[in-house]
Design a protein with these regions (language model features):
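Conserved HGGG/HGGXW glycine-rich cap/lid loop of the alpha/beta-hydrolase fold
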Residues: 26-77
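Alpha/beta-hydrolase fold catalytic core
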Residues: 1-39, 62-63, 277-282
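Short beta-strand/loop motif that positions the catalytic acidic residue
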Residues: 204, 210-212
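Flexible "cap/lid" loop of the alpha/beta hydrolase fold
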Residues: 114-122, 128-167
Length: 282
């Protein structure tokens, strides 16, 4: 898996303003770009807010983008707590309150999508709109070969990851670069836990965009499954959209990309901006 990651490019010309917020025992790093309605970005496992680099300029053109480094990732040091999307969701809710925001749009990718999902489930009053990118909501949705690869994520794999952007980013920005092995152990333990959050989908109270690659780490049918739980794909949409999902939910399957290259598609930013700009469902 490490060999396939060396070609990933998260570079961007965008220059943000970095700050820290002390929430839930974390010294949580976040970086702001642009002005406008607040938009929180939550990265994937072993990454940082820099994962969104290719799409930040487009998103920041009309929003105040707040790119967060989650627990133990990027510039946010780890604490004595498991890597758990439900706990990290509490961190994001606390950050929104810390920033004095009434509400924010929240976009999460992969691990960050799980964090975004639970933020919306647990604190719906704080989330205006939710976007989950390449996010599986049950472990069994992932292809078996990917589950096998996830089972190899542990500290002793660090030596084989030195050429990957995840390792190089961590060494460049982490408060304790020597903790990369510890992060691998904690991420590996998190991914080894069975989970199925699909029943929680029905409780979502905020408009939600489900987005994935057409060659993601799970089949597109899983995204369709989640969309169906949001009243999507149940009937013809009608001439004026009267048959679209109640609640303003949407689905986007992006062509020609994978779980790892999805940020390279200009369609990702377009889909997110279009969804966030849509009128509230009645």
């Amino acid at each position: 898996m490490a060999e396939s990651m060396t070609a990933i490019d998260w570079t961007t010309e965008a220059q943000g303003v970095g700050q820290y917020a002390d929430v839930n025992g974390l010294h949580l790093y976040y970086e702001t770009h642009g002005e406008g309605r607040p938009l929180i970005l939550l990265h994937g496992g072993l990454g940082s807010g820099e994962m969104f680099g290719p799409v930040i300029p487009a998103l920041a053109a009309g929003h105040q983008v707040i790119a967060v480094d989650l627990q133990g990732h990027g510039r946010t040091a780890d604490i004595d707590r498991p890597i758990d999307v439900r706990l990290m969701a509490d961190d994001i809710a606390a950050l929104i309150r810390h920033l004095g925001l009434e509400q924010a749009d929240v976009v999460g990718y992969s691990l960050g999508g799980g964090v975004a999902f639970h933020t919306a489930v647990k604190s719906p009053e704080l989330v205006r709109r939710l976007v989950m990118v390449s996010t599986n909501l049950r472990r069994s949705a992932i292809y078996p070969e990917m589950l096998a690869q996830q089972g190899q994520v542990r500290a002793d794999a660090a030596a084989f990851m030195t050429d990957t952007p995840m390792y190089q980013l961590y060494q460049r920005v982490a408060p304790r670069p020597e903790d990369f092995g510890r992060l691998l152990d904690k991420i590996g333990a998190s991914m080894a836990q069975d989970f199925d959050f699909t029943e929680d989908v029905r409780s979502l109270q905020v408009p939600t965009l489900v987005a994935c690659a057409d060659a993601d780490m799970f089949p597109p049918s899983h995204a369709v499954e989640v969309f169906a739980l949001l009243d999507g794909g149940q009937r013809d949409g009608g001439w004026i959209g009267e048959g679209r999902p109640k609640g303003g939910h949407a689905l986007a399957i992006l062509p020609g990309v994978t779980h790892y290259s999805i940020f390279s598609s200009p369609l990702l930013a377009e889909a997110v901006i279009s969804f966030l700009s849509a009128q509230e469902a009645t």
